[in-house]
């Protein structure tokens, strides 16, 4: 009987340990995937990355404003592949605070909003020269049914501060919803981690302010660099504890008097988000042919005019000699 009970408890402990280990592994893998793929935040929470005001939703999490640029051809022919180059400049020497509190290199990401009908070029349509510019980047559609909206990132900023998107222009002959017009292209690009998560909570890449005014009675440094700051409010005698995540530099000390919303930490953010736009013309080949024919006609007319003038001058000269 004693042997049976020992076996049962041993088996139960092993099963519990195994279940906890599996759950922990699933959590780590899932969290790592989410934290390393921040475009998924926008994809999960917004049907369209561009709001009615023109603001790209990535700005909701990346609060600092930084520049971004896009280069596209002035005009393209239907059913041709062209480059859309997104430039996300920043100082390569900068280091950001990572989720684990350590310092690391900045990543970059971008969202490209193309006109309806434009989409990512298939691999067999991309030239070797363009493939070399693209490198090992892997683009994805914002939604399966929104092939004109592309996202990329996070990718190493030191290698991909310029991102080349291979784009296939539509053909109005096969797509009746597309016309030979001038179209806008919108782009958003970020470097570094965001300051706010989609649920409204702060990351450790932003400033933390005091949630109450009073005297700092205690600063406790806990495991992994997390701080607990206890603020004693003299007006009502209550105590407030502010939690500061790891990786941040404190600006206050014990015994210091602080005000409501006073910064408790320095601002660690060295990145930011920017958005821009460009225009592209889907050119009708017949218009190009017509323009070439017109220019050729003008050149020929000029040549015949010069020849006629020389012939007239010769006739005049011969009459004068006669």
UniProtKB/Swiss-Prot annotation:
GO terms for molecular function: electron transfer activity; heme binding; iron ion binding. InterPro entries: Cyt-f_TM, Cyt_f, Cyt_f_lg_dom, Cyt_f_lg_dom_sf, Rudment_hybrid_motif. One of its GO terms (biological process) is photosynthesis. SUPFAM superfamilies: Cytochrome f subunit of the cytochrome b6f complex, transmembrane anchor, Cytochrome f, large domain, Rudiment single hybrid motif. It is a single-pass membrane protein. Binds 1 heme group covalently. Heme binds at residues 38, 58, 61-62. The chain crosses the membrane at residues 288-308. Its main location: plastid. GO terms for cellular component: chloroplast thylakoid membrane. The keyword Signal applies. Disulfide bonds: none annotated. It comes from the Eukaryota. The keyword S-adenosyl-L-methionine does not apply. Its cofactor is heme. Belongs to the cytochrome f family. Component of the cytochrome b6-f complex, which mediates electron transfer between photosystem II (PSII) and photosystem I (PSI), cyclic electron flow around PSI, and state transitions. HAMAP family: Cytb6_f_cytF. The 4 large subunits of the cytochrome b6-f complex are cytochrome b6, subunit IV (17 kDa polypeptide, petD), cytochrome f and the Rieske protein, while the 4 small subunits are PetG, PetL, PetM and PetN. The complex functions as a dimer. This is Cytochrome f. It comes from Aethionema grandiflorum (Persian stone-cress).
């Amino acid at each position: 009987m004693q042997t049976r009970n020992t076996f049962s408890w041993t088996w139960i402990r092993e099963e519990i340990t195994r279940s906890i280990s599996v759950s922990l592994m699933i959590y780590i893998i899932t969290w790592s995937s989410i934290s390393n793929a921040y475009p998924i935040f926008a994809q999960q929470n917004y049907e369209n990355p561009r709001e009615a005001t023109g603001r790209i939703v990535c700005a909701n999490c990346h609060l600092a404003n930084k520049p971004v640029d896009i280069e596209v051809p002035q005009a393209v022919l239907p059913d041709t592949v062209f480059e859309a180059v997104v430039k996300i400049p920043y100082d390569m020497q900068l280091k950001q605070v990572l989720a684990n509190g350590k310092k690391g290199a900045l990543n970059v990401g971008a969202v490209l909003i193309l006109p309806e009908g434009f989409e990512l070029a298939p691999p067999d349509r991309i030239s070797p020269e363009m493939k070399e510019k693209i490198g090992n980047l892997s683009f994805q559609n914002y939604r399966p049914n929104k092939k004109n909206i592309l996202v990329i990132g996070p990718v190493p900023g030191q290698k991909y501060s310029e991102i080349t998107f291979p784009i296939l222009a539509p053909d109005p002959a096969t797509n009746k919803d597309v016309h030979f017009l001038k179209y806008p292209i919108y782009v958003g690009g970020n470097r570094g981690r965001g300051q706010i998560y989609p649920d409204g909570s702060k990351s450790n890449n932003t400033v933390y302010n005091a949630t109450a005014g009073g005297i700092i009675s205690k600063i406790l440094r806990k495991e992994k660099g997390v701080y607990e700051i206890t603020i004693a409010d003299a007006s009502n005698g209550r105590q407030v504890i502010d939690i500061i995540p790891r990786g941040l530099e404190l600006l206050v000390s014990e015994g210091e008097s602080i005000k409501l919303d006073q910064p408790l930490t320095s601002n660690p953010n060295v990145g930011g988000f920017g958005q821009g736009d460009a225009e592209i013309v889907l050119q009708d080949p017949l218009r190009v042919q017509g323009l070439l024919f017109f220019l050729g006609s003008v050149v020929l007319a000029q040549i015949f005019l010069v020849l006629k003038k020389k012939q007239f001058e010769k006739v005049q000269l011969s009459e004068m000699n006669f």
